[in-house]
């Protein structure tokens, strides 16, 4: 299955690997499933318990998803995170969701990563903080409110 995922990551929605996984055409270690999504354990985990939330309907990214579906997915993320906390007792959790190649998206079917974190793990999700000024922040916040 690992090879199949790597070979199909850039295919279109007609041959989408995550559509096939979410709809049960490809076997997976399923943690949760309902009519909206399937939650699986990642076959290439960043850490033990690394889960993926994959909607059954194909959405390329967050920009194409309706707010109701997004809300349901985040509610499921909350429940999965609590289960990870209870079972694995991590020191933290990263919720990661990439949109577009520039953001690191490699499978163009919306999905959310829930990565349990441990004090001495080697997972990195960091960036160098940029700088801004109050005027720039004020202008941008006004533009985004439109």
Annotate the PLM regions.
Residues 2-146:
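HIT superfamily nucleotide-processing domains
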């Amino acid at each position: 299955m690992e090879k199949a995922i790597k070979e199909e990551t850039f295919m279109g929605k007609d041959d989408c690997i995550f559509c096939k996984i979410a709809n049960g055409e490809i076997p997976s270690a399923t943690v949760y499933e309902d009519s909206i999504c399937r939650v699986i354990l990642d076959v290439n985990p960043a850490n033990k318990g690394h889960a993926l939330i994959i909607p059954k309907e194909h959405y390329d990214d967050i920009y194409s998803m309706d707010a109701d579906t997004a809300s349901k997915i985040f509610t499921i993320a909350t429940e999965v995170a609590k289960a990870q906390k209870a079972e694995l007792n991590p020191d933290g959790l990263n919720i990661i969701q990439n949109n577009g190649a520039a953001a690191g998206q490699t499978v163009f079917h919306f999905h959310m990563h829930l990565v349990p974190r441990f004090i001495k793990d080697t997972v990195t999700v960091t960036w160098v903080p940029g700088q801004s000024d109050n005027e720039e922040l004020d202008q941008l916040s006004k533009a985004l409110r439109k």
